[in-house]
Amino acid sequence: SLLEIWNDKISEIGALIIKNRLEYLEILKKHAYKIFSEISGGNDELVLNYNSSISKNLDFSTPVKEIEENFRSKLQKLKSSELKCGSTLCGAHKDDLDVIINGYPAKNFASQGQQRSAALTFKLSEAIVLEEVTGESPVILLDDVMSELDPFRKEYLINNMGSRQVFIT
């Protein structure tokens, strides 16, 4: 049927997207954990987890074929529910990144300063990964970043931009 053709395609392409996200997250984590620890003065711990709607047991080492098989299986299990609601209930578009600070979900329990520190950590980590991949330093744009940072975090940010081109408003 037409639905099976679509499910095969979304499983194939979705598995590649998920695999690439998992691999990227593994690289990003290496930088993010270090930066977050430094920016918080060693007082806070950051954990990043890829929350997949396909399977809870995925990581960067999971083969893409296994992800694709899990995806197909999940689509088969959800087939009647998806037909009722008229949309896909699982896949890369439904996945999320869990940001955990000191053992608690950042979206619910982190202070504004911790959330801001996490956001800065992502920006700095992304810049480092881009530099490693492309060999070029990206331009970093930071809007209203200093207003919610304490003096220690402000100093850290300024001192750790290195030779990057940064615009702060």
Protein language model regions, located:
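Walker B catalytic acidic pair
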Residues: 143-145
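Conserved NTPase motor "head" modules and their coupling/switch loops across ABC/AAA+ ATPases, GTPases
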Residues: 2-139, 148-152, 156-160, 165
